Amino acid sequence: MASRPELVGRLLETLLKLASSGETLSVEELAKSALLSKDQVEKILEILGIPSKKVRLSEDLRLEVVLRGLELGVDGSLIARYLSWKEFEKLVARVLGKAGYGSIWNLRISSREGRVQVDVLAYRGDLMLLIDCKRWNKPPAPSEEAKIVEEQERRLRILKSLLEGISESGEGSRAVYLVPVVLSLYQPSKPLMKGHVFSSIGSFKSALDYIERAFFQLRHEKLRVKRGISLDKLVLRLRARL
């Protein structure tokens, strides 16, 4: 019973609200504020990986419990108001790092088509993920999602052109696949739109697994880069170019 998403969400929201000042909280205080029994609170704290004797959230633990709650199905709207944009970025970076991806953030790119900003460019093996992070106050309408796809298409074209220009492709080249992803706290209305992946942060690990298995069925751009150049080096060249 205590592990139901709505109960986990109720306690997590209370915890984020009361622990924002860094104070130590008791199980009794949390139970009273969240309208839960002491046993329920202790069980949920155990699920979230929080010691129940003295409840205090460091920044690192705060991000871990938010991620754990989202993975358990907690509604993102319950906790969105308690997360800064910086904390959302750190959540994304944590998931990417655990999955073995390198990443660079907040790339501002100029081209003949104009300027675009790339929130996250993540890379591992022969995959590069063009990630657009959205911190909506509510789930987006389908029309908003369609507009986001258009914006991602533009970023995709510009980034592909730029990467090919610095990759020294030609004889002895290899393929790298650039895949667009849209990420937010909320579950999207659809996980795919015109081949573009939409994912909540709580489902992001599963989305990464899916992308790695089926990227060739998704919207992607195939790049040719010099064989022997790692994506780390390619990203360094991109940084230098920008």
Report each predicted region and the residues it spans:
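Intrinsically disordered, low-complexity Ser/Thr/Pro/Gly-rich regulatory segments
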Residues: M1-V118, A122-L242
